[in-house]
Every structure is written in C-alpha cells, then in structure tokens.
Amino acid sequence: MVYSMDLMPIILASQSESRLRLLKKINIVPSQIIPANIDESSLPAELPKNLALRLAIQKADKIAQNIEDGYVIAADTVVAVGRRILPKTITDFDVEYCLKMLSGRRHRVFTGVKITKVKHNNIIAFNTRTVESIVKVKRLTPQEIATYVATKQGLNKAGGHSIEGMWECFIQFMRGSYSNIMGLPLFETRNMLFSLGFDCIRSNQ
C-alpha cells in the first residue's frame, strides 16, 4: 500500500511503458500520465549528462505549471559513446546506426530525473538527480545487427535498443543501476519522493 504524508496524486510526465512498469515495482500507479512533448534536441557541445537533466527539468516544468496538486515525475534517458549522443530512434536505419556505434564498446546511460511537488497551483518543492550506468556490448556480427533490427525492439528507444528484450544477450557487463538503464533509477526516485514527503514503501497497516 502506498503511503503519502499528504495524499497528493502522482503524475508521470511520460508515456514510456518502461517507466510505468518501473513505478509499479515500487507500488506507484500514477493518477495521470501526461506526456510533456518537448523539443529533445541537444544544444551545441552539450554533454550527455547535462542533456538528460535539462530535458527532465523541461518536462517536469511544463506539466507542473498546469497541475493543481500532485507530484510530477519527469525523466529523460540519454545513451552516449564517449561524448557522442546516440539518437532516439525513429527508423530501422537509426537502429542499425546505433548498433554499429555500440558494437564492441562501452557506453554510458544517463537518466535525468526531476520530481516537482505542486500544491494549490504553486510549486512548493522539487528535487533533481542524474544517474549514470555503464554498459559493455560484445562485438556484434552483421547477422546479429540485422536480426535485432528486424525485431523492431530498438525503435523509439534512446540508443536504438531496449535492455528488456533480445539486447540483454549482447551485454558483456554492466555497472550501476539496472533500472536506470531501463529509464528510471528506482533507488534514487524513491529517495527523491521521500525527501518531498511521499513514501511509496511504507504501509498504513
């Protein structure tokens, strides 16, 4: 049972099914899902971790200004090889490009998170965090790349892949938060909510 010290609703500023599933793991079912629909383009010379946090902040701010009461959770995930930011894929060509960039290399996954507490149409508190995980992918064969592209699992994903599917069998090692790689670091998210007055673990019983 979710325990909130002020019983305000949770609003997820994302239509990501992965983030919704992750929140359910910590007993949170958002009252509303409101995608922010912002321009997610990077700025010139912007670092990957800065992009992830900037976009999360913009998403949270856009939704929070239209909320009467609640906690707005916004996140953005960026995949980078060195300082090269990989795209959020739209086409099979995008996925193939990302896989070739990731093949045989380490890459970093950054998720920026902002949680904003709104009461009586006023922002009364917020918390931000950026979490980094490191992943090493095996050297992929042309057949492995073609097979993964054909699954369509990499479409509409940061870096052209989803760790929840076939991609996991290509990973040699990971360091850091697994849920961060999926799109929402649960340890940090729970602590951020708690600092704002919401405990998703404590039971009323």
UniProtKB/Swiss-Prot annotation:
Q: Which Pfam families match?
A: Maf
Active site residues according to the UniProt entry: D76
The protein's annotated catalytic reaction(s) are: a ribonucleoside 5'-triphosphate + H2O = a ribonucleoside 5'-phosphate + diphosphate + H(+); a 2'-deoxyribonucleoside 5'-triphosphate + H2O = a 2'-deoxyribonucleoside 5'-phosphate + diphosphate + H(+)
- EC numbers listed for it are 3.6.1.9
Q: Which SUPFAM superfamilies match?
A: ITPase-like
Which GO cellular component terms are attached?
cytoplasm
Could you tell me where this protein is found in the cell? Cytoplasm
| Broad EC category | hydrolase
UniProt main location, coarse? cytoplasm
Query: What Gene3D superfamilies does its record include?
Result: 3.90.950.10
Q: Which family does it belong to?
A: Belongs to the Maf family.
Q: Report the protein name in the record.
A: Nucleoside triphosphate pyrophosphatase
Q: Which organism is it from?
A: Orientia tsutsugamushi (strain Boryong) (Rickettsia tsutsugamushi)
